[in-house]
């Protein structure tokens, strides 16, 4: 407690569901010099958490005033907002997010461009009517190989077929994955479920083999999104277009193989040229639709969290576009002053977070009219290089993680404009200047997974970080 004689009248309240965390809302006076730690002490005293036994261990809390996280003393908050100590403040308290600690690092053969996870609680499993016993990690690499890892760090299976660097990977179900790369292809692959169950249309293919090659893009395909309720896929291409596909190849039109340009295939790899010839026996499918409106390469694409008929994309043309996937029309365009490289939607608030070449992250509300002057609700600053990957927290509607070419992953809460934590690379290979992060994913069982230039899949997890 501070000796500062200046005090302020406050009351505490919480929206925590745990009734044991409720304190009286009776007003009390506290020193204006108190910060988060001191306020946390007060709440723990009110809760009777004296630390004398395991049941009364003090709990770290965060505090919000009018929905904004308090990151300074009460006095600094009052000064910044032009308020006096005569003000009566209502302070919301919630369990604090603890720092994510380094858990493990898995080796990969080349730079990691993309990551995804699967576990028994995710829609890719629950909507498939299949089972999975342990979480798994899916990686796409610049060596052209897709890999699945178990939680011991062992590669369970490799998927070889792309003739250039992989740029995007996603789980579709426990028995199916999708990948995309610089060879302009989107590929559906067959894997195997823990319980041995295989969808009927997959039975003829061997494990680890390509079910279908999805063709339509005329330049590298750098991002994928999968919508499990509608069984649809979106792909972002450097040909300025977005591909709209089905996870079931039988729903798409059969086509003949595209002619391969010599500059698409790796000029130094006879093996990959031979691989391309072998692909001539694999079924090919055309997109359900190609969405055209962007004027520069499309960097990322997602489905709306609650409406499978809506998609969002970001591009080097500085815009965020909203798509009606029923009519294949662009229904909204929002312009910024910089190339946009990544996008994610936060579930409850519906806000779109976009990472940029200008090193910051903007929050946009797609429900605000495009005609309004202020389309950006907030700007989050902290990275010192391109922000190329974003992942929403699986359990906290206000939080997400960002991966950057500055070699860090940052954890953000939209209720404050500064990052909560910064995760750095743990591998000795990640020397300054060769430590770019290209991919980040956030799994409710595994933790925060990141990968990039150091050829490592790094896992960080903090107690209660998602709560």
Curated annotation (Swiss-Prot):
WD repeats lie at residues 120-159, 161-199, 216-255, 293-333, 335-374, 382-422, 432-467. Residues 105-467 are annotated as: Sufficient for interaction with ERB1 and association with 66S pre-ribosomes. GO terms for cellular component: nucleoplasm; PeBoW complex; preribosome, large subunit precursor. InterPro entries: G-protein_beta_WD-40_rep, NLE, WD40/YVTN_repeat-like_dom_sf, WD40_repeat_dom_sf, WD40_rpt, WDR12/Ytm1. GO terms for biological process: chromosome organization; maturation of 5.8S rRNA from tricistronic rRNA transcript (SSU-rRNA, 5.8S rRNA, LSU-rRNA); maturation of LSU-rRNA from tricistronic rRNA transcript (SSU-rRNA, 5.8S rRNA, LSU-rRNA); protein-RNA complex remodeling. Belongs to the WD repeat WDR12/YTM1 family. The keyword Nucleus applies. Component of the NOP7 complex, composed of ERB1, NOP7 and YTM1. The complex is held together by ERB1, which interacts with NOP7 via its N-terminal domain and with YTM1 via a high-affinity interaction between the seven-bladed beta-propeller domains of the 2 proteins. The NOP7 complex associates with the 66S pre-ribosome. Interacts (via UBL domain) with MDN1 (via VWFA/MIDAS domain). HAMAP family: WDR12. Its main location: nucleus. This is Ribosome biogenesis protein YTM1. It is found in: Nucleus, Nucleolus; Nucleus, Nucleoplasm. PANTHER family: RIBOSOME BIOGENESIS PROTEIN WDR12 (PTHR19855:SF11), WD40 REPEAT PROTEIN 12, 37 (PTHR19855). Transmembrane segments: none annotated. Pfam families: NLE, WD40. Keywords: Nucleus, Repeat, Ribosome biogenesis, rRNA processing, WD repeat. Component of the NOP7 complex, which is required for maturation of the 25S and 5.8S ribosomal RNAs and formation of the 60S ribosome. The lineage of its organism: Eukaryota, Fungi, Dikarya, Ascomycota, Saccharomycotina. Residues 8-95 are annotated as: Ubiquitin-like (UBL) domain. It comes from Scheffersomyces stipitis (strain ATCC 58785 / CBS 6054 / NBRC 10063 / NRRL Y-11545) (Yeast).
